[in-house]
A protein has these predicted regions:
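A contiguous loop/helix-start segment that scaffolds small-molecule binding in enzyme catalytic cores
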Residues: 1-63
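Core SAM-dependent methyltransferase catalytic element
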Residues: 34-40, 215-234
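Conserved class I S-adenosyl-L-methionine
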Residues: 83-92
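Conserved SAM-binding loop of SAM-dependent methyltransferases across substrates and taxa
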Residues: 93-105
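Short beta-strand element of Class I
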Residues: 106-110
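S-adenosyl-L-methionine
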Residues: 112-153
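Short beta->alpha hinge that forms the Motif I/post-I loop of the SAM-binding pocket
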Residues: 113-118, 158-161, 184
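C-terminal substrate-binding/active-site "lid" region of AdoMet-derived donor-dependent transferases
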Residues: 168-227
Length: 234
């Protein structure tokens, strides 16, 4: 059980120390105090690596999210590093942004997501997975990008073919920054092919399948194929 220690009125005549269990804390303490928490995991606590590719069920989501295998490849392509800022355009439940922040000390992320329910899910996920500094913009791109700080990396997981989204993102990205875009529709894939021809980078296809029960046997069920474009702005 996690333990709390409260040090109150330090250095004064009324200096006090309080100790107890976080679960059963009932003591009244002075307003001016220092709180120390000894975090002790419960028997059912889940331990997650900081390596990209958390289980899908680690996130609250509505089914529309970047699945684990593709997410791991996306985080690898983005190459998080300390104190770097990511824009996650079409952030959904926040899975990419949150894994970016978990992967490198001091890394920050801003999500751009117009759907209110998904914004709320992403806020919950950020707190529960240890990325409380994740911030989110409740606007569509490109309008929601205008006042944001310059990013070191950008991920476009939604809205790629919307008018002005890519141009605004590419203009904002700092020189030397990385942009990764995932496509599952033919229209967005065609756009990535054109961008790859014009700007270079790497264009990959990600195929993934997962075993499911088929009666008393099992078979491999494929996920939607993802085309991924990665480019560094020169």
């Amino acid at each position: 059980k996690s333990r709390l220690t409260v040090l109150a009125a330090l250095g004064g005549p009324d200096e006090q120390r309080f100790e107890g269990s976080a679960e059963n804390w009932s003591q009244e303490v002075p307003d001016f105090h220092v709180l120390a928490v000894e975090c002790i995991a419960g028997p059912n606590a889940k331990y997650f690596s900081r390596t990209g590719g958390l289980p899908d069920d680690a996130f609250e989501h509505d089914g529309q999210m970047t699945k684990r295998v593709v997410r791991a490849a996306t985080i690898s392509a983005l190459q998080p590093y300390p104190d770097a800022l990511l824009w996650d355009i079409g952030s959904g439940c926040g899975s990419i942004a949150i894994e970016w922040m978990r992967a490198a000390r001091g890394a920050e992320a801003i999500g751009i997501e117009p759907d209110e329910k998904r914004r709320e899910m992403s806020k919950h996920n950020a707190i529960s997975l240890g990325a409380p500094r994740f911030s989110i913009v409740d606007q569509d791109a490109p309008e929601g990008l205008e006042a944001l700080p310059i990013p070191d990396a950008i991920f476009i997981g939604g809205g790629l073919t919307d008018e002005g989204v890519f141009d605004a993102a590419w203009t904002a990205l700092r020189s030397g920054g990385r942009l990764v875009a995932n496509a599952v529709t033919l229209e967005s894939e065609a756009m990535l092919v054109r961008l790859h021809k014009d700007l270079g980078g790497t264009l990959d296809r990600i195929f993934a399948s997962q075993a499911i029960a088929v009666g008393r046997y099992h078979g491999m069920k494929p996920f939607m194929t993802v085309t991924q474009w990665t480019v560094v702005k020169s």
